Swiss-Prot record:
Name of the featured protein: Acyl-[acyl-carrier-protein]--UDP-N-acetylglucosamine O-acyltransferase
Recorded catalytic activity of this chain's protein: a (3R)-hydroxyacyl-[ACP] + UDP-N-acetyl-alpha-D-glucosamine = a UDP-3-O-[(3R)-3-hydroxyacyl]-N-acetyl-alpha-D-glucosamine + holo-[ACP]
One Gene Ontology term from the biological process aspect of the record: lipid A biosynthetic process
Naturally occurring in which organism (per UniProt): Paraburkholderia phytofirmans (strain DSM 17436 / LMG 22146 / PsJN) (Burkholderia phytofirmans)
Highest rank taxon of the organism: Bacteria
Gene name of the record: lpxA
GO molecular function, one term: acyl-[acyl-carrier-protein]-UDP-N-acetylglucosamine O-acyltransferase activity
Length: 262
């Protein structure tokens, strides 16, 4: 049987695995599904059409699955889907999607979401992401796997943050950060390749060297973006461990709608 504090409210229709723990004064809505071994802290609210996987930890006073902060929202049954083993700390807010997008906000697995983070409607957060305290994601933001967003940072709507990238604290990000790149500032500017993060994740020296060369092409050689793309295509087929990550970088740049930080 689920371990639910007597002061918690679990609305009829909610589906909780028998191993779920719900703390004092928490509220679980009627359309919520919570997987095994997940814990919900005191005074937290999980509402809307929200699904949580297994082994998640929801901190005190978190608000998960709330209505989108979008004036076009008309009570459609949009969703929030959260994977497994995520930590979502105190006072975090995560909203469901809107019909103007795909109707769903998603978080992957093994994410570390610190206190007072906001994840807006229609955001898509990958896996193994760190969002530091007070980081604020506007609607429709996409964050790749293993990315880090520093505390007190603001991210504009529709911005993409590439895998393995890092945004420094107190930054304002209005354009896309390519994968593997460090950015910081108001407004955020590029500051090199996330070498230490790549080493920790097992990238080979050859792969890191190739990404450093790609960074020079993109940011240091005085090339236009179109000229840089031509040279990146050559680097991406040079042979060796560097091909795959450079191809990932190039594909991200080519797909950018808002433009990349420059």
């Amino acid at each position: 049987m689920s371990r639910i504090h007597p002061t918690a409210i679990v609305e009829p229709g909610a589906q909780l695995d028998e191993s779920v723990e719900v703390g004092p004064y928490a509220v679980i809505g009627a359309h919520v599904t919570i997987g095994a071994r997940t814990t919900v802290g005191s005074h937290s609210v999980i509402e809307g059409h929200t699904t949580l996987g297994e082994d998640n930890r929801i901190g005190h006073y978190a608000s998960v699955g709330g209505r989108p902060q979008d004036m076009k929202y008309k009570d459609e049954p949009t969703r929030l889907v959260i994977g497994n083993r995520n930590t979502i700390r105190e006072f975090t807010t995560i909203h469901t999607g809107t019909m103007q997008d795909a109707g769903v906000t998603t978080l992957g697995d093994d994410n570390w979401i610190m206190a007072y983070v906001h994840i807006g409607h229609d955001c898509h957060v990958g896996s193994n992401v760190i969002l530091s305290s007070n980081a604020q994601m506007a609607g429709h933001v996409t964050i790749g796997d293993h990315a880090i967003v520093g505390g007190m940072s603001g991210v504009h709507q529709f911005v993409r943050i590439g895998a393995h990238s890092m945004l420094g604290g107190a930054s304002a990000l209005v354009q896309d950060i390519p994968p593997f790149v460090i950015a910081a500032g108001n407004k955020a500017e590029p500051h090199g390749i996330n070498v230490e993060g790549l080493r920790r994740r097992g990238f080979s020296p050859d792969a890191i060297s190739a990404l450093r060369a790609a960074y020079r092409v993109l940011y240091k050689n005085g090339l236009s973006l179109e000229e840089a793309k031509v040279q990146l295509r050559e680097l991406a087929t040079a042979g060796g461990d560097g091909d795959a990550p450079v191809q990932t970088l190039l594909a991200f740049v080519e797909a950018s709608q808002r433009g990349i930080i420059r």
